[in-house]
């Protein structure tokens, strides 16, 4: 509907949904859940005060919320609740936040719908610390993956 992806776009989130390599290597070890409709994984980019945040994507290439089929949107929403509860139980965080961007004016920079779920801690200043990000190693992500996968069983 309101699409902005460039011609010949190679979608990194489609690659993750299919279990393929991305420009940042394989993300398969970061996947905490996958079914025929959605994939959830520990994000590749972290904010230092909020490690282990999760991204949920539709497996089908859907650029933004405007094109989201209701059935898949409901599955993403339902799973985001499971992630939020898992954060509270396993990360012992003080709260959670979700974030989702559409179109360039909405700060979308990957042309595949994705919902971020962040663990929140009192005084973490998540929305003020955009410069305090980094790309964690697979080893650094592993304890978060294991906690969430175990909780989801």
Residue ranges with predicted function:
Residues 1-153:
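HIT superfamily nucleotide-processing domains
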């Amino acid at each position: 509907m309101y699409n902005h992806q460039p011609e010949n776009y190679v979608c990194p989130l489609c690659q993750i949904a299919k279990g393929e390599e991305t420009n940042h290597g394989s993300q398969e070890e970061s996947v905490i859940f996958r079914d025929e409709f959605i994939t959830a994984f520990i994000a590749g980019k972290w904010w230092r005060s909020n490690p282990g945040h999760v991204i949920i994507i539709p497996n089908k290439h859907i650029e933004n919320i405007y094109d989201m089929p209701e059935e898949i949107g409901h599955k993403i929403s339902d799973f985001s609740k499971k992630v939020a509860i898992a954060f509270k139980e396993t990360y012992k965080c003080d709260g959670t936040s979700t974030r989702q961007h559409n179109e360039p004016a909405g700060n979308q920079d990957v042309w595949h719908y994705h919902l971020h779920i962040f663990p929140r801690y009192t005084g973490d200043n998540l929305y003020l610390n955009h410069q305090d990000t980094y790309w964690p190693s697979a080893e650094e992500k592993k304890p978060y993956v294991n906690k969430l996968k175990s909780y989801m069983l």
